[in-house]
Amino acid sequence: MASEKRILIMAGGTGGHVFPALAVAKALAKQGWQVRWLGTADRMEARLVPQHGFDIDFIDIKGVRGNGLIRKLAAPFKILRSIMQAREVIKEFKPHVVLGMGGFASGPGGVAAKLSGIPLVLHEQNAIPGMTNKLLSRIASRVLCAFENTFEGNAEVVGNPIRSELIALGRSEQPIVPDDALRVLVVGGSLGAKIFNDLMPSVTAAVAQHHSMTVWHQVGKGNQAQVEAEYLQLGQSGSVKVAEFIDDMEAAYRWADVILCRAGALTVSEVAAVGLPSLLVPYPHAVDDHQTKNAQVLVEAGGAFLLPQTVLDSEKLISKLQILASDRKALIEMGQLAKSVAVLDATERVAAVCIALASKEKDD
């Protein structure tokens, strides 16, 4: 154990935190690093991280933003306890570097790393940093981010780590055949997006009156039967595939000509990496409206249309899809422009920072 470099990774809660962290974890593991995870037992990292072959420790911590008075009064004591729990993990594992990539465990874990004298690397996936990373950026050894102007100060823009399989997808090399049906991928996240489920059946029927279009619609848990019935009622079932989840997103990205989706940081980064034109509808209740800021990167490059949910209706969606269906050259150009802002070596950049900091630490 003395000659093997060790990293403790803190990431959890959502796929937007966990999947980029897994990409870095796998890159370091391939180089012989021992990887251990710090998370919470009731969030998705508890299931996903062991599935990918990494050990995980849990601390007791919840979010404090927007909760009631009693929970806020109790929060300092709970945070102190979770910091102590994280220090115990660090004391036992003896990491050379700690990497925080978001989620409830990152706050206590980051403070514990500082108290333990372990270099702390932060990575912020969103264009607007979360409260925890804003605070931790003051004590971190290195601060990394995916987008320009995320932090004030000396943050390094490195992009968002994504799965190597998506980088190798090569979607942009596959020409769009003008006479083919427009292939629309609709992705609303694990719970689906109600507005997509409500609008797309009638939108598909309207566009189909003038253009050939096929739809692959991910509707979220418990919504499949109802959405399928709506497509069927409008005579569109033959050109639509409805699924609660899409397990193989690589296949979905490869299939699609355009995607209708939210604007989470990971989604925006993946869409750019595969060169897929997009219709972005930021989640309107995201903290600090960070999804709108995420979307601007692709929109300003010309690789996406921004459709704020507050003004989105069937007519606007029909109009955008008809434009794309009738102008395949513009669709191809959008994909190329999306690809132009992709950062394809983000995983390696984050890993390199961790390696550089660890190299300054003596082996135990």
Curated annotation (Swiss-Prot):
It holds the Pfam family Glyco_tran_28_C. The keyword Kinase does not apply. Pathway: Cell wall biogenesis; peptidoglycan biosynthesis. It comes from the Bacteria. Transmembrane segments: none annotated. It is a peripheral membrane protein. It is found in: Cell inner membrane. GO terms for biological process: carbohydrate metabolic process; cell division; cell wall organization; lipid glycosylation; peptidoglycan biosynthetic process; regulation of cell shape. UDP-N-acetyl-alpha-D-glucosamine binds at T14, G15, G16, N126, R163, S190, I246, A265, L266, T267, V268, S269, E270, Q291. GO terms for molecular function: UDP-N-acetyl-D-glucosamine:N-acetylmuramoyl-L-alanyl-D-glutamyl-meso-2,6-diaminopimelyl-D-alanyl-D-alanine-diphosphoundecaprenol 4-beta-N-acetylglucosaminlytransferase activity; undecaprenyldiphospho-muramoylpentapeptide beta-N-acetylglucosaminyltransferase activity. It catalyses: di-trans,octa-cis-undecaprenyl diphospho-N-acetyl-alpha-D-muramoyl-L-alanyl-D-glutamyl-meso-2,6-diaminopimeloyl-D-alanyl-D-alanine + UDP-N-acetyl-alpha-D-glucosamine = di-trans,octa-cis-undecaprenyl diphospho-[N-acetyl-alpha-D-glucosaminyl-(1->4)]-N-acetyl-alpha-D-muramoyl-L-alanyl-D-glutamyl-meso-2,6-diaminopimeloyl-D-alanyl-D-alanine + UDP + H(+). The keyword Lipid metabolism does not apply. One of its GO terms (cellular component) is plasma membrane. Cell wall formation. Catalyzes the transfer of a GlcNAc subunit on undecaprenyl-pyrophosphoryl-MurNAc-pentapeptide (lipid intermediate I) to form undecaprenyl-pyrophosphoryl-MurNAc-(pentapeptide)GlcNAc (lipid intermediate II). HAMAP family: MurG. Belongs to the glycosyltransferase 28 family. MurG subfamily. This is UDP-N-acetylglucosamine--N-acetylmuramyl-(pentapeptide) pyrophosphoryl-undecaprenol N-acetylglucosamine transferase. It comes from Shewanella loihica (strain ATCC BAA-1088 / PV-4). The lineage of its organism: Bacteria, Pseudomonadati, Pseudomonadota, Gammaproteobacteria, Alteromonadales. The gene is murG.
